[in-house]
Curated annotation (Swiss-Prot):
Stretches the record annotates as Disordered: 70-544
Protein modification: Proteolytically cleaved by neutrophil elastase, in vitro. Prolines at the third position of the tripeptide repeating unit (G-X-Y) are hydroxylated in some or all of the chains.
Effect ascribed to mutating P575L: In FECD1; uncertain significance
This protein's name: Collagen alpha-2(VIII) chain
SMART domains to which the protein is assigned, alphabetical: C1Q
Database matches in PANTHER family: COLLAGEN IV NC1 DOMAIN-CONTAINING PROTEIN (PTHR15427:SF33), EMILIN ELASTIN MICROFIBRIL INTERFACE-LOCATED PROTEIN ELASTIN MICROFIBRIL INTERFACER (PTHR15427)
Composition bias type Gly residues, residue spans: 206-224, 433-442
Region ranges (Nonhelical region (NC2)): 29-76
Triple-helical region, as annotated region: 77-536
Tissue expression notes: Expressed primarily in the subendothelium of large blood vessels. Also expressed in arterioles and venules in muscle, heart, kidney, spleen, umbilical cord, liver and lung and is also found in connective tissue layers around hair follicles, around nerve bundles in muscle, in the dura of the optic nerve, in cornea and sclera, and in the perichondrium of cartilaginous tissues. In the kidney, expressed in mesangial cells, glomerular endothelial cells, and tubular epithelial cells. Also expressed in mast cells, and in astrocytes during the repair process. Expressed in Descemet's membrane.
InterPro entries tied to this protein: C1q_dom, Collagen, Collagen/C1q_domain, Tumour_necrosis_fac-like_dom
Amino acid sequence: MLGTLTPLSSLLLLLLVLVLGCGPRASSGGGAGGAAGYAPVKYIQPMQKGPVGPPFREGKGQYLEMPLPLLPMDLKGEPGPPGKPGPRGPPGPPGFPGKPGMGKPGLHGQPGPAGPPGFSRMGKAGPPGLPGKVGPPGQPGLRGEPGIRGDQGLRGPPGPPGLPGPSGITIPGKPGAQGVPGPPGFQGEPGPQGEPGPPGDRGLKGDNGVGQPGLPGAPGQGGAPGPPGLPGPAGLGKPGLDGLPGAPGDKGESGPPGVPGPRGEPGAVGPKGPPGVDGVGVPGAAGLPGPQGPSGAKGEPGTRGPPGLIGPTGYGMPGLPGPKGDRGPAGVPGLLGDRGEPGEDGEPGEQGPQGLGGPPGLPGSAGLPGRRGPPGPKGEAGPGGPPGVPGIRGDQGPSGLAGKPGVPGERGLPGAHGPPGPTGPKGEPGFTGRPGGPGVAGALGQKGDLGLPGQPGLRGPSGIPGLQGPAGPIGPQGLPGLKGEPGLPGPPGEGRAGEPGTAGPTGPPGVPGSPGITGPPGPPGPPGPPGAPGAFDETGIAGLHLPNGGVEGAVLGKGGKPQFGLGELSAHATPAFTAVLTSPFPASGMPVKFDRTLYNGHSGYNPATGIFTCPVGGVYYFAYHVHVKGTNVWVALYKNNVPATYTYDEYKKGYLDQASGGAVLQLRPNDQVWVQMPSDQANGLYSTEYIHSSFSGFLLCPT
């Protein structure tokens, strides 16, 4: 009985070993028996056939060389130690997809040998490959013809204010037409009390007329002052232009204060007077801005014009980066052409329909790059296997070689929306698209950074004079300028002999005159007083005063050329002065008080009043130099309350302007000359401790 069971037990054990050895091999190999219970799964995404690698069969399908003792059937032994990996077997045929396993991903296998070259045939379009390396720049292509000019786009938002342009050339503009009277302005704050002016003559009160102001009437006799009347209603007229100062009237006797009389009724409106003489006006105050008018309707689009010439390259500043656009559909790779020169920017094309995203591909493990073999035939895409267990993400392998471009395939069915892929490198510039229709106006973007200053444009036509702007703040005090070069001596003046003046103080001894003709000897006389000054050389030119009282100037010599030397004109006989202003924005309507004197011969200039009183009659030269800041300036040189010359400067914002004027005047003793701003609407006279406005005058020749 025992001998009968022993061969049977050996046979059962041998069968068990065969079953254990063949079972895993069948499961791993994917035989027919293993795949009987799983139907092949079809996927929409075609799979690309890759290089055939070595099968991972280390340690499988080999017999274990272990002693097999005869043990009972129900006795289980301990698992033995793992055996050594056997030799690599030949690659088997590809089997059907097996049941998805639950194990961990294995190690990367070695690349297999290159297969024999296959037959070339037209394959189906595969998924987009990895972007290739940027090739060398191609030869420049032919210049394309300019495209058809597109329709004018919508008006963009206003840009940021640019930097102030350079100062233009100042030319006098044409006087504009009389503007529409503006609404009455708000009542201003009371200004500071001015200094009392010289008392003027009191004239008769005229009737309220509605015409233009007539010629000034003759001054009447001083009447008794009436009582203060009730304040009348506020007028609605605009302030008139400042008229020219009238001629000074005869000084009348001041009458005794009278009893205030009752307020009389307004008289009848007088007839309209003749138009007055055109006066020299000043710009009126700026009116209130009018309400903003409604925006006009959009005009009809004009006819398409001919294509314009290519303009010069602009120097615009970069705009703000726009929002990130949606990822477009992956296009079919086209044939690589020669790289041409970048074409001109075309008009935006019409937005195409958004393509459907392809299905996500199965993540494969990147193998080590093998040696480049000959290209094999592209096989048919096999049926997709069931999704495997996601493996551990491997390191990114090197970029593969660029494949041959395939023929565009037919449009497939829309796949499910895949996850967003990584951002690829920047592609080559595409061809210029067709001009698209105007898009919907987007929302206003944020204000961009201040761009670089552009090149100054061409000077535009002179505009009409603008309204008077508000006075700006006083700027910081600048540095004193460099001393100017001394001017050339002027030509000798042609004056007539004046009347003999009053005897001045005794001057220094003059240069001895040339000896005269010897006369007959006279009787000896008593000792006389000191000799009179030497003869005055009429060809001398006034120059610099010397400490000894003489004048260093030029003398006309031979040929009319000046010869510099020591003249004989006494400094005590030449009234002259120079005064500067050390405070900005003096009051208008009264003499400007140049408060610091640099030289004041004969003390003819009074810095407390700003008036020069003529001490010696003769021909004088006066000059004034002023700085302008904050607003326009209108300066006049007055002689005995009558303007002699006017100077007007239109202020440019952001600059410190200069204005000057001068005149030669004939004065009698006690005549008065001063500088004054006639209007308070153009009173931008500026001066500081280190930026001086000055007033000078000196006697050219006595009369």
